[in-house]
Amino acid sequence: AANVNLRHGVEDVRQLPMEQAVTFMGQIRSAGRQEMRLPGRYWRNNKMDLATCLKKMELVGVLAFATVDSEGAPQIRNISAIHYEPDALYFFTARGKNFCKELMEDGRVQILAYTKYKEMIRLSGKAYAVAENEQKKWMDIIFEEQPYLANVYPGDTREIGIIFCIDKAEVEYFNLGVNPIFRETYILGNVSVKEKGYYITESCIGCGTCMKHCPQKCIEKGTPFVIRQEHCLHCGNCYENCPVKAVIRK
């Protein structure tokens, strides 16, 4: 952020490309000025997208993978042996691990990344084992990108490994470090997204109770009133306090 220093305000930061702005915000926090926050519309105008989410996941490096075991209980572990393509994720594990067993039996997985800028990225999809004739290709790529793996699986011992792929997923971006908060959902591959959150129906009487109870002030007047979905926390305050039950939950 060469053209901005710590004396400048939010208006100056808004003019920066996203990556420079992120760097600058890190400088602000290091200097103890955590009260300065970029507005949610900054991130919207700078077009957060799937590619940026995947890049942020790659930069975080170690991601939390959640699966379901044979008894229906959630299991979670950290995974870093991951290779990123624009349209897919490939990752390595060993065939003898419970993680592999869960992926082979069920396949459903959620991956969570959390950045130092209070951004959360959650990928929900289904993993499958890569075709046998593609296993070596992706394994070699992952071992080249993650040199530590050679210490974990030296020489031919890597052959106990198996490569899984996720190429269809819902990717949710949720940023608590901006005001108002910012959220958006992206698609990896050909999948449909289930609608989430709260919506105001035609039963709205325009009393404004929902606006008063919204912590992010993301409800706008109208007929009916409208919730700005990209800034909604999904806290349910509007839903619980509407006097005529005009707010519905998807």
Where are these regions (language model features)?
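Extreme N-terminal basic, low-complexity initiation segments
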Residues: 2-16
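Short, Lys/Arg-enriched N-terminal segments with co-localized hydrophobic residues
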Residues: 29-47
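Charged, gly/pro-rich active-site loop segments
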Residues: 43, 126-194
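A short, Trp-centered hydrophobic/proline-enriched beta-strand micro-motif
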Residues: 55-72, 109-113
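A short mixed-secondary-structure module that forms the rim of ligand-binding clefts
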Residues: 82-118
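Helix-adjacent hinge/juxtasegments
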Residues: 109-136
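Iron-sulfur cluster-binding cysteine motifs and their immediate structural context
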Residues: 209-226, 237-250
